[in-house]
């Protein structure tokens, strides 16, 4: 797997919502364009800042696709891929289209408080399943 260099200013994007709680794609496009045009060196999509856990699987996939298409290769993208269930995360890693992304970002399962060995096993499984470099 090729290493990537993450230098400079990375911005974790928020996910804007409409009044009906659907994703506001017009506002999301504005956020992306603002960050790219103002010098962000890379963007982090669907991390904890973006409220990714409140989105359905199809919404997460659509946001990831939309941002990748909007950025169109102008700067690197990192896709947030986290879950409290390692097994479910493995399935999501297999099903996700990573087109346009340079790496994934994964956080420690936060609800069930795994042991140090559990954290190690979780991230070992993530690293083995991910087709991209993993940022912890």
Each language-model region and where it sits:
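Active-site beta->alpha loop and helix N-cap motifs at the rims of alpha/beta catalytic domains
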Residues: 2-136
